[in-house]
């Protein structure tokens, strides 16, 4: 429990209007309390950490000077919005972030009127803010609209599409874009723009000019002296900063300024509030600011489990192998014997398990920044030249490159392997990061082969199978650990389109896909039913399914994907095409976006854990409920 008496100023702030009652001279103390409160609260509950520490001063300045929620703040990505949540009526609930029934991990319109746009994926803020500014302009509304973008989001093409549109409009919309430049996404930001911004902020000449002025005038600058120094600095900045890029796109550029210097932020924002048309303010921040361990390990402290801020994160001992670990090990093993293998990630080196590969095979590793569309077509181009690219990508981010998957890869039947991490139920990160649609949107694409492993050993075999297959393949696996089946060191392959009969029983066939094989087997063995590990979503094992349809009363399909258009739909379509009428119960995720909760709670809620499978069976075939098989036996 947090002692509010340790935060006397912050305790007076329930909404931003309360913040505006403070004198500007008091805001430094408010910022210190807010940063310390964030450290203490996230230490208790876990959650996104370093990004929020980096925008404490910026968040305070924005809510202090802008009349939120009338004025609109549009945050990009959302990792950095814990300070925003704390200042907008959710301070006492911040420790519930990511927990079932608690605060969402990202801005969410249903949660607060101060959350003007729901986010979780990157690079959407400028487009959304521009849309708001256009409508305000049409209505003659004087509200201010501010997009805050950073954490690598400016490496995505969508941001430039919005800048290009906004800067070329007539009449010009009143829009402020704040570039929060911390040179990071989750991993280090990469690419030409990042290097250009780095040249601006790291210029020795510019810093020498700035520091020289401080030494000469100290804290005794008059207003006239301060104006002179600002003009002199702006003149020199023009020689070092990327103002030309944004100016040519139709934006008035201001910066770069220190994003932790509250007087500088307040001064710049006061001026920008009075200006018309598209404006861009470039601020330099440090991810993890104010917590030394996070500043020193910005990747490690991006998102954290509960920890003691006095001690920092404790290095975990030996842990159970995750599916991501299986992929990471397989990738390096296959690269050792297959020189054609190239690996691509859209800014998710750590999360997708590419750290070791990037170190051992740096010339074969391509981090394209937050650019999923480019990543996939880059892979397509590589494949045309005989390479075998492996695209390591989260299921939720694969959605952002769907046209490229369809048009550039599948249409041309190019040899690209998609290692789709975080498929199905993801858990605490909520709806924006769930992988509950991928089986549906991949299954319908011609030329695609699609697999989902039941365990770690099978995941390795599927990756090898996909690598050696001629054509586009997706291996879709979940977040976290599996049942603990240790993979072989071999690079064995599976026969394409062949399922695995796990248990030969009678009456009902339970068809499990991916992680849902485990509950199917737990229930099926107990009740003497047939259990199948389907392995392939596409192509399905037609021979086995037709044989089972001939010898069983009904099927139950079980998948951690939405039922609509999913793996079970494929089974029904196959039987229908053969003119076979058979009762089928489809178990899967509901036609709804997942909320944040633990994976276990979400699986149970969807009825695809062992207890849910058992209950569904009894609902359709009540006579299966014999005395020897109570619900408790399989829950």
From Swiss-Prot:
Catalytic activity reported: D-glyceraldehyde 3-phosphate + pyruvate + H(+) = 1-deoxy-D-xylulose 5-phosphate + CO2
A biological process from GO: terpenoid biosynthetic process
Matches recorded under Gene3D superfamilies: 3.40.50.920, 3.40.50.970
Residue numbers binding Mg(2+): 151, 182
SUPFAM superfamilies: Thiamin diphosphate-binding fold (THDP-binding) (SSF52518), TK C-terminal domain-like (SSF52922)
InterPro entries assigned to the protein according to its UniProt record, in alphabetical order: Dxylulose-5-P_synthase, THDP-binding, Transketo_C/PFOR_II, Transketolase-like_Pyr-bd, Transketolase_BS, Transketolase_C, Transketolase_CS
Residues bound to thiamine diphosphate: 79, 120-122, 152-153, 182, 291, 372
Enzyme Commission number, as recorded: 2.2.1.7
Molecular function terms from GO: 1-deoxy-D-xylulose-5-phosphate synthase activity; magnesium ion binding; thiamine pyrophosphate binding
HAMAP family: DXP_synth
Role played: Catalyzes the acyloin condensation reaction between C atoms 2 and 3 of pyruvate and glyceraldehyde 3-phosphate to yield 1-deoxy-D-xylulose-5-phosphate (DXP).
NCBIfam families named among the record's database cross-references: dxs (TIGR00204), PRK05444.2-2 (NF003933)
Protein name stated in the entry: 1-deoxy-D-xylulose-5-phosphate synthase
Native species: Xylella fastidiosa (strain 9a5c)
